């Protein structure tokens, strides 16, 4: 009996050994088993992982099956021209490698669009798989990236035609022209045209690309290529996809970053956030769950409770099962594009809260937008857009103005993000506007990196600017003046300078301080409404501050006669007005320049002419003698009422404010010809004939033209007028000396009197007091040479003993 028992045990052991051997052979013979299957998933819920991987894995073939598959597959060699084009695409047309994922998702979206369209007329089109999704999965262990869609799929013929052939008619001519354009440094975007070759961007990051596809009208096939040749064969596993396509990339070593979940998620959000179909990424998250304790853990815990003197005894029936909190990694599909493109809906159907929520999500801002506009543009190019004005100006708005690219306008084509790297989508002065532009028919070049036809971009730009200005115009006056103008007023002024075609529209948005109100700002429309009956010009005065502008001698008579004067207090203001020739048929008049005239009666005209004749000796004396090289001419002023004189620029010269701004420029070197020309223009010296100083000067000049006091007075008046008119003095020391001389004369002090010399100080006696006391000398001698050296080095003051 014992012998039979031993024999039976041996048989069982032998049988078990054969079974294990068979299992080991089967495992060893499998190469690339479960290609694409993530090992992270297998460490968690096996059933979930198996179910999900069945829909996304490429194959589960063993080594012999893979060898047979590759031996029986039909191989195709890329033609020389196609191979050349492939290299051109990989090396030349794509500016950055990360766009490969955008292209693959875009192709997947196109395939989903096609099957959805087919399903409208064919009720069985979605029978194989009713889902319409894109799924992305990373397999770091096997260096694989999978992109699966449930779109229309491809037949064998379509795999060969669509993925194996890029060549079109005239390919050689196309390549030659492109090569010539590159050698000449010209743009190739016009030559490229619209090729459907975004798929080949996969070779930017992959050594090998494997495509498994199932079409409703054909069996499932596998397409494989290393960019040199490709092969196609029927999938021996049969129909594992149901319908759709899986693209598997065997990534290059330097492209391993694209296996990181964060990298893939960021790329999906960046480029494909608004795709119409849901995009999922197989990702993990850590959850804290409670699990029952094992028996040994429970026993240990009960022992610890028993040993604890402070433990509270619990009744048997109240005891609950022992559990512990455990952190567990859970894998599942995470939706990436949960933000819907609200610009695709009619504006009437979108609530205000939806616009605000979209703006905050889109711009990463916490505040609501100040204004927004949602519109559809039709014509030469059709697109939909939503534009926003932020509540506050972005930080560094004018840093590198004009050279810094604006990334606030994002361009989409069929909800696929193309670029926000623009120099010319919006003009520089509107660099604060944020928004999206989405077009279904915008032509792109092969790499989607640059717009194919720049004229269409100009059409889009033109419409965006018009809509933006309409949006700004509709902002309520109170909000506009209190908020918008403080944040973006400088932008509007720059727009007047830069945008000639929209200058009239922008002029209506301008706001300035004026003499009409001490604090409120005014528009040009409001100024024109308040103009006097026969006033034909808009008067303005520029200064570094309102106080300087309104205290200028140039505005004295204007304010006295009731004319409103606009105050320009910002450095850009005078440039802005100079670029604006007129507004509503009214020309602008700088009151610091020539040309200010008032309506006068015949009697007033006769009085003015008589005054000019009376002061003709003084005017000629100033022009030909006292101020000979300093002024263009001297005239009797019509604009002064309180000040004795003023220095007026010519129509084409610089005002004092403009000269100060130009000389303060960091790049000003003094070598610019035009700058030197404007700066060297002589001014007109206007005098007030009713001022006592001027009348007394006339009397003195008539008595003695060579009177030195009058000569000094004329120069001092000129230099004072230079300062009050906003100009800088070339020699401030000479001006100070003349003022001092005038003060001496007014106090009856001799102009030649010298400053009293300071009394010379007597040199201090450095010798030490000595006495005849022999005992003191003896004590000092006994102090030793060492103490004397110390006293000499420290230069101590004589002690009380020494003084005695």
UniProtKB/Swiss-Prot annotation:
A motif (Prevents secretion from ER) lies at residues 801-804. Its main location: endoplasmic reticulum. It comes from the Eukaryota. Glycans are attached at residues 62, 107, 217, 445, 481, 502. It is an enzyme of class 3 (hydrolase). Residues 795-804 have a biased composition (Basic and acidic residues). The modification N6-acetyllysine is found at residue 479. It catalyses: ATP + H2O = ADP + phosphate + H(+). Residues 1-21 form the signal peptide. The SRT pseudosubstrate motif associates with STT3A during translation in normal conditions, preventing glycosylation of facultative sites until HSP90B1 folding is completed. ATP-dependent chaperone involved in the processing of proteins in the endoplasmic reticulum, regulating their transport. Together with MESD, acts as a modulator of the Wnt pathway by promoting the folding of LRP6, a coreceptor of the canonical Wnt pathway. When associated with CNPY3, required for proper folding of Toll-like receptors. Promotes folding and trafficking of TLR4 to the cell surface. Belongs to the heat shock protein 90 family. This is Endoplasmin. It comes from Rattus norvegicus (Rat).
């Amino acid at each position: 009996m014992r012998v039979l028992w031993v024999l039976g045990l041996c048989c069982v052991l032998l049988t078990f050994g054969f079974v294990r051997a068979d299992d080991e052979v089967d495992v060893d013979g499998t190469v690339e088993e479960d290609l694409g299957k993530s090992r992270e998933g297998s460490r968690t819920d096996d059933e979930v992982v198996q179910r999900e991987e069945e829909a996304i894995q490429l194959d589960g073939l063993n080594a012999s099956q893979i060898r047979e598959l590759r031996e029986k597959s039909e191989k195709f060699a890329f033609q020389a021209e196609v191979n050349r084009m492939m290299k051109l695409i990989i090396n030349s047309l794509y500016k950055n490698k990360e766009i490969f994922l955008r292209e693959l998702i875009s192709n997947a979206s196109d395939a989903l669009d096609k099957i959805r369209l087919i399903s409208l007329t064919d009720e069985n089109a979605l029978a194989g798989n009713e889902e319409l999704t894109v799924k992305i999965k990373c397999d770091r262990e096997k260096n694989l990236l999978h992109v699966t869609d449930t779109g229309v799929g491809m037949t064998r013929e379509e795999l060969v035609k669509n993925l194996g052939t890029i060549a079109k008619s005239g390919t050689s001519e196309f390549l030659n022209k492109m090569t010539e354009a590159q050698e000449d440094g010209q743009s190739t975007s016009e030559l490229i045209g619209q090729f459907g070759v975004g798929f080949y961007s996969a070779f930017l990051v992959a050594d090998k690309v494997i495509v498994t596809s199932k079409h409703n009208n054909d069996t499932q096939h596998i397409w494989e290529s290393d960019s040199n040749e490709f092969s196609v064969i029927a999938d021996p596993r049969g129909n594992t996809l149901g319908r759709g396509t899986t693209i598997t990339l065997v990534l290059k070593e330097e492209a391993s970053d694209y296996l990181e979940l964060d990298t893939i998620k960021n790329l999906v959000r960046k480029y494909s956030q608004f795709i119409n179909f849901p995009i999922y990424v197989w990702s993990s998250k850590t959850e804290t769950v409670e699990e029952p304790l094992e028996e040994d853990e429970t026993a240990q815990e009960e022992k610890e409770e028993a040993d604890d003197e402070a433990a509270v005894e619990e009744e048997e029936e109240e005891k609950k099962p022992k559990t512990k909190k455990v952190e567990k990694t859970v894998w599942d599909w995470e939706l990436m594009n949960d933000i819907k493109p609200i610009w695709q809906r009619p504006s009437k159907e979108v609530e205000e809260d939806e616009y605000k929520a979209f703006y905050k999500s889109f711009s990463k801002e916490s505040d609501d937008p100040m204004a927004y506009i949602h519109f559809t543009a039709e014509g030469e190019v059709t697109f939909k857009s939503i534009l926003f004005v932020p509540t506050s100006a972005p930080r560094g708005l004018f840093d590198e103005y004009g050279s810094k690219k604006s990334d606030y306008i994002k361009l989409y084509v069929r909800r696929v993000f193309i670029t926000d790297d623009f120099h010319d989508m919006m003009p520089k002065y509107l660099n604060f506007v944020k928004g999206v532009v989405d077009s279904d028919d915008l032509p792109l070049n092969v790499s989607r990196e640059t717009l194919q036809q720049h004229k269409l971009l100009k059409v889009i730009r033109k419409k965006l600017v018009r809509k933006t200005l309409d949006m700004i115009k509709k902002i309520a006056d109170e909000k506009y003046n209190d908020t918008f103008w403080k944040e973006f007023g400088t932008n509007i002024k720059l727009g007047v300078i830069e945008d000639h075609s929209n200058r009239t529209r922008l002029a209506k948005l301008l706001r300035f301080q004026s003499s009409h109100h001490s604090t409120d700002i005014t528009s040009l429309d409001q100024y024109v409404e308040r103009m006097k009956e026969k006033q034909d010009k808009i008067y303005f005065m520029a200064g570094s501050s309102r106080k300087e502008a309104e205290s200028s001698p140039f505005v004295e008579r204007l304010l006295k006669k009731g004319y409103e004067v606009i105050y320009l207090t910002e450095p850009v203001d005078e440039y802005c007005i100079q670029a604006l020739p007129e507004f509503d048929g009214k020309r602008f008049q700088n009151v610091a320049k020539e040309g200010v005239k008032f309506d006068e009666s015949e009697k007033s005209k006769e009085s003015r002419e008589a005054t000019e004749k009376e002061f003709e000796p003084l005017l000629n004396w100033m022009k030909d003698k006292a101020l000979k090289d300093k002024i263009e001419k001297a005239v009797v002023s019509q604009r002064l009422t309180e000040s004795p004189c003023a220095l007026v620029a010519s129509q084409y010269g610089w005002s004092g404010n403009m000269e100060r701004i130009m000389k303060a420029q960091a790049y000003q070197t003094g070598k610019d010809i035009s700058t030197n020309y404007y700066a060297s223009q002589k001014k007109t010296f206007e005098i007030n004939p009713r001022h006592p100083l001027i009348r007394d000067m006339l009397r003195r000049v008539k008595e003695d033209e060579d009177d030195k006091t009058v000569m000094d007075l004329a120069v001092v008046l000129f230099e004072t007028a230079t300062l009050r008119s906003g100009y800088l003095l070339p020699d401030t020391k000479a001006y100070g000396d003349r003022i001092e001389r005038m003060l001496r004369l007014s106090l009856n002090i001799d102009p030649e009197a010298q400053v009293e010399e300071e009394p010379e100080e007597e040199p201090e006696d450095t010798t030490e007091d000595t006495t005849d006391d022999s005992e003191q000398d003896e004590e000092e001698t006994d102090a030793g040479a060492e103490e004397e050296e110390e006293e000499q080095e420290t230069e101590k003051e004589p002690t009380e003993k020494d003084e005695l």
